[in-house]
Amino acid sequence: DFSKFERGYKKLDFPAANGNFIFYTIADLNKRKNLQAFIKAFHAEFDPSEPVSLLIKSSKYGLPPEETAMKIKDMCNHIKRGLRKFPDVNDYKEDLIVTDFISEEEICRIHRTCDCFVMPSYGEAWCIPAFDAMGFGNTPICTNIGGMSDFIGDAGFLIEGMMEPVHGMIDTLPDLFTANESWCSVSVQGLMDCMRHAYENRDGLKSMKKTGLKRAYDYSHKNIGNLIKDLLNADN
């Protein structure tokens, strides 16, 4: 439904982020999504005095929202302690964590509220949230892997990484996501650099946002259907 990109959505109210530039992600809570890289890059790059915020919308199958929120908060605090920039984790910028099960309209409100989408995952087939963020004009910053490499192009930032054996995917089928496979570990420094650039060059990203909306429409059912029809006709 591409019309959602053009609808008016009321922005959500996050008092701690009032007036801030918000980096955000929408992702399941699992190892493949690599939320740790996003959290580390944000708090390593930005000082608490800067008007920027981090928002994580996440959920985990079979886990109540409040437990999911606690797991993410513990993850954030563990990373902050490891960064050792400040003596207390409370000295860092407050993280915005949303774990309630919400409607598609509420997801669209998150896109409309935030400014720059970040997906540092180890691998993606497509990544619907990144595609939708691009359609909403929220310049995506993503690992250069999978479907994101195809649809983002020059409408966002694709960060290189290193291929390494899969590790830590314990909540899946026994024959999937083993060390016999490889995935891409994104450069945290690359994330930091692109997040800084997006924050400091908002006016310069306007053309990129327009490109993102155009590229989103390139993948409409109609356009893809016509492409498939042309390919089938070419074989006749």
Model regions: which residues?
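Acidic anion/phosphate-binding donor-loop and adjacent secondary structure
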Residues: 1-18
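Nucleotide-activated donor-binding/catalytic signature segment of Leloir-type glycosyltransferases, i.e.
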Residues: 65-108
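Short hydrophobic beta-strand element within catalytic cores of glycosyltransferases
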Residues: 139-142, 157-160
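A short, well-ordered alpha-helix in the C-terminal region of glycosyltransferases
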Residues: 190, 197, 204-218
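C-terminal alpha-helical cap of glycosyltransferases
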Residues: 201, 221-236
